[in-house]
From Swiss-Prot:
NCBIfam families named in the record: rpsC_bact
PANTHER family reported for this sequence: 30S/40S RIBOSOMAL PROTEIN S3, SMALL RIBOSOMAL SUBUNIT PROTEIN US3C
InterPro entries with a match to the protein in the record: KH_dom (IPR004087), KH_dom-like_a/b (IPR015946), KH_dom_type_2 (IPR004044), KH_sf_prok-type (IPR009019), Ribosomal_S3_C_sf (IPR036419), Ribosomal_uS3_bac-typ (IPR005704), Ribosomal_uS3_C (IPR001351), Ribosomal_uS3_CS (IPR018280)
Subunit structure: Part of the 30S ribosomal subunit. Forms a tight complex with proteins S10 and S14.
GO cellular component: cytosolic small ribosomal subunit
Keyword rRNA-binding in annotation: yes
Organism annotation: Geobacillus sp. (strain WCH70)
Keyword RNA-binding included in the entry's annotation: yes
Residue ranges of every copy of the KH type-2 domain listed in the record: 38-106
Protein name: Small ribosomal subunit protein uS3
Protein keywords: Ribonucleoprotein, Ribosomal protein, RNA-binding, rRNA-binding
Length: 218
């Protein structure tokens, strides 16, 4: 059986960048665990704020965190109170100076993480898995996606035997490295156990820009 590599990991260094950007020698393991703690804390604290991606950069004793969210108002809070409280909590957690940037996601229906989380929440609210997937596909295509594929796995509809069902529309060229494909997973906790949700969204091609050389401007 052909297995599918993670489309995001496959494109790192080509059209995607790392979510953590820092270099360390001795303290690598400690900083990696710190990154995991930061991500876990932010996702838990902002679980209703539609957070898609958390980027972490480090320089000396400073941590720069960029939070990509579809609900920036909820993250920032009234007069910046929420983001300031989050910054203080992360400073206490890491023991370093923390700076937080908030980036708004303009089209949440084209973000695989948010689409997967949305399908998972609907499944927890006992919405039919077929209906949840088809609605997500329609919204993504209306938002301008070139293609989308969704898959839900587990005891669908409370069946005794677990299975997977997937739906797709448009094209999702997983082998084309210049194709901007967003991929994410989510879990739904239902009365029959966990259901796994996977989403692939093709947002069009990204052509790598050629760097001009100083000689002749080629």
């Amino acid at each position: 059986m052909g297995q599918k590599v993670n489309p995001v990991g496959l494109r790192i260094g080509i059209i995607r960048d790392w979510d953590s950007r820092w270099y360390a020698e001795k303290d690598y393991a400690d900083l990696l665990h710190e990154d995991l703690k930061i991500r876990e804390y932010i996702n838990k604290r902002l679980q209703d704020a539609a957070v898609s991606r958390i980027e972490i950069e480090r320089a000396a004793n400073r941590v720069n965190i960029t939070i990509h969210t579809a609900k920036p108002g909820m993250v920032i809070g009234k007069g910046g109170s929420e983001v300031e409280a989050l910054r203080k909590a992360l400073t206490q957690l890491t023991g370093k100076r923390v700076h937080i940037n908030i980036v708004e996601i303009k089209k949440p229906d084209l973000d695989a993480k948010l689409v997967a989380e949305n399908i998972a929440r609907q499944l927890e609210n006992r919405v039919s898995f077929r209906r949840a997937q088809k609605q997500a596909i329609q919204r993504a295509m209306r938002a301008g996606a070139k293609g989308i594929k969704t898959m839900v796995s587990g005891r669908l509809g409370g069946a005794d035997i677990a299975r997977s069902e997937h739906y797709s529309e448009g094209t999702v060229p997983l082998h084309t490295l210049r194709a901007d494909i967003d991929y994410a997973t989510a879990e739904a906790d239902t009365t029959y156990g966990k259901l796994g949700v996977k989403v692939w969204i093709y947002r069009g091609e990204v052509l790598p820009t050629k760097k001009k050389t100083e000689e002749g401007g080629k």
